[in-house]
Amino acid sequence: MNISIEIKERDTDHIDIFVAGEIDAYTAPKVKEALEVYQVKEGIVLRIDLTEVSYMDSTGLGVFVGAFKSLRQRQSELVLFGLSDRLFRLFEITGLSDIIEIKNVEGEMNGNNA
């Protein structure tokens, strides 16, 4: 199982991360490692595009919950984009869609919206 992670720093406060592949017990540590770099910064907006993620299990959810908690403690934001219906349902069933900001409009990653 492969995962691809691309990071684009738009400026010091806005970071876009594009993830493609499957997020499971095998690949989640790679995603976690990529996010940890930004979890120590204050006042940032970390935007993660999951448009190309075909599968996620509870390990992946745990990575995003951990990132959300760390970022919130530092007055930073986590925003998820481009979830498939299946992925969104996973966040919805677990109640995480009420806590973590989710925007399903893929084009918003290219705009100025945080």
Swiss-Prot record:
Biological role stated in the UniProt entry: Positive regulator of sigma-B activity. Non-phosphorylated RsbV binds to RsbW, preventing its association with sigma-B. When phosphorylated, releases RsbW, which is then free to complex with and inactivate sigma-B.
Name this polypeptide is given: Anti-sigma-B factor antagonist
Residues modified as Phosphoserine: S58
GO molecular function, one term: anti-sigma factor antagonist activity
PANTHER family with a match to the protein in the record: ANTI-SIGMA FACTOR ANTAGONIST TM_1081-RELATED-RELATED, ANTI-SIGMA-B FACTOR ANTAGONIST
Keywords per UniProt: Phosphoprotein
UniProt PTM: Phosphorylated by RsbW on a serine residue.
Membership in a protein family: Belongs to the anti-sigma-factor antagonist family.
InterPro entries per the UniProt record, alphabetical: Anti-sigma_ant, STAS_dom, STAS_dom_sf
Positions of the STAS domain: 4-114
